Design a protein with these regions (language model features):
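Long, low-complexity, compositionally biased intrinsically disordered regions
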Residues: 1-97
Length: 97
């Protein structure tokens, strides 16, 4: 079985990292994702939301020695991490593969 990477993760992975509620909210924002950048180390995007300026969202994966994979995310929205903007960015990256 291959290790999950930023170019191979699935929507099920996103749900396990962020929860079904954030994924549902994020799905409505996938059309608001701009300047999406994906590489081996991180995903970065601007996501339009309720603020005048778009939020900057980012994510990277951490592969633990025990085999567990966790997502480290950040966003300039008031929530700050693991939010609907991060979910939208991750879902949009899947859509654009």
């Amino acid at each position: 079985m291959s290790a999950v990477t930023l170019t191979t993760y699935t929507e099920d992975d996103v749900t396990s990292w962020l929860g079904a509620k954030e994924v549902e909210k994020g799905r409505a924002y996938t059309g608001q994702v701009h300047e999406l950048e994906v590489d081996d180390q991180r995903i970065l995007a601007l996501v339009s939301g309720s603020a005048r300026q778009p939020y900057t969202s980012s994510a990277r994966l951490v592969h633990h020695k025990n085999g567990r994979i966790s997502l480290i995310s950040g966003c300039t929205c008031p929530v700050g991490v693991d939010c609907k903007h991060v979910a939208a960015m991750l879902l949009k990256a899947i859509d654009e593969r």
